[in-house]
UniProtKB/Swiss-Prot annotation:
<keyword id="KW-0687">Ribonucleoprotein</keyword>
<dbReference type="InterPro" id="IPR035987">
    <property type="entry name" value="Ribosomal_uS8_sf"/>
</dbReference>
<dbReference type="GO" id="GO:0006412">
    <property type="term" value="P:translation"/>
</dbReference>
<keyword id="KW-0694">RNA-binding</keyword>
<dbReference type="GO" id="GO:0003735">
    <property type="term" value="F:structural constituent of ribosome"/>
</dbReference>
<dbReference type="InterPro" id="IPR000630">
    <property type="entry name" value="Ribosomal_uS8"/>
</dbReference>
<keyword id="KW-0689">Ribosomal protein</keyword>
<protein>
    <recommendedName>
        <fullName>Small ribosomal subunit protein uS8c</fullName>
    </recommendedName>
</protein>
<dbReference type="GO" id="GO:1990904">
    <property type="term" value="C:ribonucleoprotein complex"/>
</dbReference>
<dbReference type="GO" id="GO:0009507">
    <property type="term" value="C:chloroplast"/>
</dbReference>
<dbReference type="InterPro" id="IPR047863">
    <property type="entry name" value="Ribosomal_uS8_CS"/>
</dbReference>
<comment type="similarity">
    <text>Belongs to the universal ribosomal protein uS8 family.</text>
</comment>
<keyword id="KW-0150">Chloroplast</keyword>
<comment type="subunit">
    <text>Part of the 30S ribosomal subunit.</text>
</comment>
<keyword id="KW-0699">rRNA-binding</keyword>
<dbReference type="GO" id="GO:0005840">
    <property type="term" value="C:ribosome"/>
</dbReference>
<comment type="function">
    <text>One of the primary rRNA binding proteins, it binds directly to 16S rRNA central domain where it helps coordinate assembly of the platform of the 30S subunit.</text>
</comment>
């Protein structure tokens, strides 16, 4: 049984936010790098970078906090498609999270995309997670 690196990334960021820990270190894979870039581009995290220790690569993510409140921008995240149960959607049926305030991250034939990008390119794929 393999590790689910997407769930590790999402859970690590969510747990770090709950205990107000600023940075998270997870194993770097192509999928986690792409999801990290999407979260950075959409403004849910402040920074993401790759770090190497010996032969292992890690992804270090820094949480983004609101100014006066000690709350993060990424309030909730939910893993949708799991290794035991894959969930697919065409571009017309991609759900909207909180009326468009959150994002859906999809794995498509053109890479890891947000729901807006997938609708614009008119391609569907596997729904990986919701973030809001």
């Amino acid at each position: 049984m393999g590790n689910d690196t997407i769930t590790n990334l999402i859970t690590s960021i969510r747990n770090a936010d709950m205990v107000e820990k600023g940075t998270v270190r997870v194993t770097a894979t192509n999928i986690t790098k792409n999801i990290g870039r999407i979260l950075l581009r959409e403004g849910f995290i402040e920074d993401v970078r790759e770090h190497q220790e010996g032969q292992k690569y890690f992804l270090i993510s820094t949480s983004k906090y609101r100014r006066r409140k000690k709350r993060t921008y990424m309030t909730t995240s939910k893993r949708t498609s799991k290794p035991g149960l894959r969930i697919y959607s065409n571009y017309r049926e991609i759900p909207k999270v909180l009326g468009g305030m959150g994002i859906v991250i999809l794995s498509t034939s053109q890479g890891i995309l947000t729901d807006r990008e997938a609708r614009q390119k008119k391609i569907g794929g596997e729904i990986l997670c919701y973030v809001w």
